[in-house]
């Protein structure tokens, strides 16, 4: 009782003291609020459009992936340079940078290459509505290139930059070299926390060519702009504009290089809606594309539009999808389907099919099946079957469907520092149509024989930072097919190190590479009068050195360093010891 009274008295005393200390001063309502508080500038990583590339799972070794470092920190200057790393690819170059670069694969002419820009077919348009000049597709807006290799076809998926961080990123590149080569490139990428994004890339190239050769003066301007809005990972919308304009001057000697002025503009609208934030489950994709080609005095301007509606479903061990496309009058509609599945852990199955309707009541079908099996000791076996009864150039009214069945298989061995793959394939005969407009002496390709061929691909790292890689291609026919000489190989040796013991922060990197592309004698199609062109054997070497310090990269590249007299196409020579060098700056925030 006494303790309770004492406690109550103590509380009353404290309360009285506190009341005596109450501040009775009137509040100053004119005082300004503290504005020194900083807003949250910590970068946030936001959702982005899923990369439009082949849906997996796929058998190991069927896909080649080239991330941004593959063409930003390497000797690749064009898309064709990247594809030269794939066994069996022949790049028919009209000369130095700026001249035509036509990728030939599988003896199928224009049907050997399919290109998709963010999942949308990139169709040839303009003076050449059959072949794509891959040297004129700028790498500047791209963050990734995936290539799905079929027995006689390359499906190339180009993925544009997808900025996810709210930290603003920008890049500047300046390069110069022989023939008054000049390259200026700039990019700016920004994402806001609301989900809004803006990306801009500008790329300017110019050179004065080499007098008296097929390497004539060239100038190009590539612009790319993309705006996107992804309020949640489940839904998003984007619109991008890709504009490319270039001019190639005629050669001093008639019949080598024609005057070629060209401007292409693509507008791509995309929308997606998914059921889950992790990208699994049902998903809807919609795309609408407009493309125009102009500025060429040799042909009238032309435009086309495309629409696509895709429905798919992904889960942990597979996917299934169907796409309906409506394209130009030459391709009224296409229905595509794809599926992949891992029924058992060592087994992977994949398939895709297409049914197409073309102008003049023509139809086309194709089917591709693939399987892969993981074996002990790091071995993997895979096989592909591609059947088609399809057109190769729907823009040509004379094109008719050709029936082909192509089969390939490979055995791959992967260890920690070594990869070896040996493949065999059989392709049906084929008659390519048309001729590349940028390769003036080439009047077309001759018929391709039914061919069996051997490919070998290997990569080896004997020491940390030291890499050897290469491939070998051998068609088992006595004379070879056009641009498929009996022996063709590419090898390279690369040194790459960040010198961690000296630069512990990782601020420094050094890369050096020497590569060689060599082939034996063969045939190179037909000239403009129908006579067979002989392809001389040749060896071209190149060297690349790059030094990276933080966000600055200094590079030097020399092509045809061994001074080879000749070229990749008969009659079109390649400059000897052509070199260019420059610097790239990468800024963040």
Model-predicted regions and their roles:
Residues 22-74, 162-166:
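N-terminal periplasmic "start-of-domain" segments of outer-membrane beta-barrel proteins
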Residues 42-56, 63, 80-121, 159:
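Extracytoplasmic beta-strand/coil segments of soluble accessory domains associated
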Residues 52, 79-82, 101-104, 116, ...:
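N-terminal periplasmic accessory domains that precede
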Residues 59-60, 143-144, 151, 160-181, ...:
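Transmembrane beta-strand segments of Gram-negative outer membrane beta-barrel proteins
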Residues 120-149:
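Short acidic/polar hinge/loop motifs at secondary-structure boundaries
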Residues 152-156, 163-223, 235:
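Outer-membrane beta-barrel translocator/receptor signature
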Residues 213-214, 232-283, 287-308, 328-331, ...:
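Flexible loop and strand-edge segments within Gram-negative outer membrane beta-barrel domains
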Residues 283-291, 300-589:
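Exposed, low-structure sequence patches enriched in small/polar residues
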């Amino acid at each position: 009782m006494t303790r309770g009274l004492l406690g109550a008295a103590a509380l009353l005393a404290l309360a009285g003291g506190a009341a005596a200390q109450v501040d009775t001063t009137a509040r100053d309502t004119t005082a300004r609020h503290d504005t020194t508080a900083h807003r949250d500038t910590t970068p946030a990583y936001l959702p982005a459009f899923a990369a439009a590339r082949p849906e997996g799972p796929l058998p190991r070794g069927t896909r080649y992936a080239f991330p941004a470092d593959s063409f930003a920190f390497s000797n690749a200057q064009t898309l064709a340079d990247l594809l030269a790393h794939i066994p069996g690819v022949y790049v028919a170059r009209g000369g130095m940078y700026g001249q035509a670069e036509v990728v030939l694969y599988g003896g199928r002419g224009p049907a050997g290459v399919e290109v998709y820009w963010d999942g949308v077919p990139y169709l040839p348009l303009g003076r050449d509505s059959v072949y794509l000049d891959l040297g004129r597709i700028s790498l500047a807006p791209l963050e990734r290139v995936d290539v799905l290799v079929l027995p006689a076809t390359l499906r190339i998926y180009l993925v544009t930059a997808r900025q996810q961080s709210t930290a603003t990123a920008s890049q500047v590149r300046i390069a110069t070299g022989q023939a008054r080569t000049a390259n200026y490139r700039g990019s700016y990428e920004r994402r806001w926390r609301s989900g809004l994004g803006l990306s801009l890339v500008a790329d300017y190239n110019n050179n004065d060519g080499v007098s008296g050769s097929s390497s004539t003066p060239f100038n190009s301007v590539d612009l790319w702009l993309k705006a996107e809005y992804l309020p949640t990972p489940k839904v998003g919308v984007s619109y991008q504009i890709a504009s490319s304009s270039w001019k190639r001057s005629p050669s001093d000697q008639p019949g080598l290089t024609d005057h070629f002025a060209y401007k292409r503009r693509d507008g791509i609208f995309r929308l997606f809606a998914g059921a889950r934030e992790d990208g699994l489950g049902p998903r809807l994709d919609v795309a609408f594309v407009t493309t125009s080609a102009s500025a060429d005095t040799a042909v009238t301007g032309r435009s086309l539009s495309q629409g696509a509606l895709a429905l798919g479903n992904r889960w942990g061990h597979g996917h299934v999808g169907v796409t309906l496309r409506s394209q130009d009058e030459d391709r009224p509609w296409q229905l595509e389907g794809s599926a992949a599945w891992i029924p058992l852990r060592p087994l992977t199955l994949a398939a895709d099919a297409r049914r197409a309707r073309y102008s003049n009541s023509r139809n086309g079908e194709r089917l591709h099946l693939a399987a892969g099996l993981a074996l002990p000791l790091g071995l993997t076996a895979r096989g592909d079957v591609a059947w088609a009864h399809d057109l190769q150039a729907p823009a040509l009214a004379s094109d008719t469907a050709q029936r082909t069945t192509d089969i390939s298989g490979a055995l791959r061995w992967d260890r920690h520092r070594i990869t070896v793959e040996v493949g065999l394939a059989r392709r049906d005969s084929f008659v390519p149509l048309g001729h590349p407009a940028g390769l003036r002496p080439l009047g077309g390709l001759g018929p391709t024989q039914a061919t069996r061929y051997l490919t070998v691909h290997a990569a080896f790292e004997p020491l940390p930072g030291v890499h050897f890689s290469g491939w070998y291609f051998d068609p088992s026919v006595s004379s070879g097919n056009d641009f498929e000489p009996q022996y063709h190989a590419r090898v390279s040796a690369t040194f790459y190190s960040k010198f961690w013991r000296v630069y512990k922060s990782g601020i420094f990197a050094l890369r050096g590479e020497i590569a060689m592309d060599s082939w034996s004698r063969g045939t190179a199609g037909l000239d403009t009068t129908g006579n067979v062109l002989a392809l001389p054997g040749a060896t071209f070497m190149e060297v690349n050195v790059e030094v990276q310090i933080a966000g600055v990269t200094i590079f030097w590249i020399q092509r045809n360093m061994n001074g080879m007299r000749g070229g990749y196409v008969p009659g079109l020579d390649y400059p000897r010891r052509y070199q260019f060098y420059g610097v790239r700056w990468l800024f963040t925030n």
